[in-house]
Amino acid sequence: MTISSNTALVLFSGGQDSATCLAWALSRFDRVETVGYAYGQRHAIELECRETLRNEMAAFSPDWKARLGEDHTIDLASLGALSETALTREAEIGLSENGLPNTFVPGRNIIFLTFAAALAARRNARHIVTGVCETDYSGYPDCRDDTIKALQVTLNLGMDQRFVLHTPLMWIDKAQTWDLTEELGGQKLVNLINRDSHSCYMGDRTHQHDWGYGCGTCPACNLRADGWRRYQQSRPSHGGAA
């Protein structure tokens, strides 16, 4: 089987980071497909946001519409059933005994990327794009650069492929992620992702803030709000640095 050197598969949850990664991929590759996962997450509303974002991205420019390919959703309910975490159970968000946030789903990104690689092999895609980062993240060990590099080696050895795992957000924070969004598509794309992506762990799409929708109190909302505030402060029109 010949793997296309210019086809990408984006892990696309419907959140800010993965939406930015989708725009990044559409700016670089000839064909881009997306994959999302249903794993019993409390914020399953993000899966509904995926379709809206894909439609908006396709309408963003003729080039992006031509490049955007098929969407895939994979059922990983067993992952949620195994995980006693605040993302998959009705539990108060806090720290676990090991010091990690109890929103950490053990092995989630490793499993996501493994399934993505299996799908990429079937879809003849060499490039796999994920929005993990270790700049202003929650301490999840499967978001670290070392983990992703090790996994790339493992997947290529185990599947006899030459996949490239791309992490365009690995070394930038949430404010810089908005900068990247603006660089990719101007204020129009910033507004699109602000309005239609979802970050809130509580699945709240009823309360709208200047940074997007969410409960405004969970760690994901706090991180997004802080990133938006710093992004706005850095813009010349708001008196920040150029």
Swiss-Prot record:
One of its GO terms (molecular function) is ATP binding. Pathway: Purine metabolism; 7-cyano-7-deazaguanine biosynthesis. Keywords: ATP-binding, Ligase, Metal-binding, Nucleotide-binding, Queuosine biosynthesis, Zinc. Its cofactor is Zn(2+). This is 7-cyano-7-deazaguanine synthase. It comes from Gluconobacter oxydans (strain 621H) (Gluconobacter suboxydans). InterPro entries: QueC, Rossmann-like_a/b/a_fold. Transmembrane segments: none annotated. Binds 1 zinc ion per subunit. PANTHER family: 7-CYANO-7-DEAZAGUANINE SYNTHASE. ATP binds at F12, S13, G14, G15, Q16, D17, S18, A19, T20, C21, L22. Gene3D superfamilies: HUPs. Catalyzes the ATP-dependent conversion of 7-carboxy-7-deazaguanine (CDG) to 7-cyano-7-deazaguanine (preQ(0)). Zn(2+) binds at C200, C215, C218, C221. Its EC number is 6.3.4.20. The gene is queC. CDD domains: QueC-like. One of its GO terms (biological process) is queuosine biosynthetic process. It catalyses: 7-carboxy-7-deazaguanine + NH4(+) + ATP = 7-cyano-7-deazaguanine + ADP + phosphate + H2O + H(+). Belongs to the QueC family.
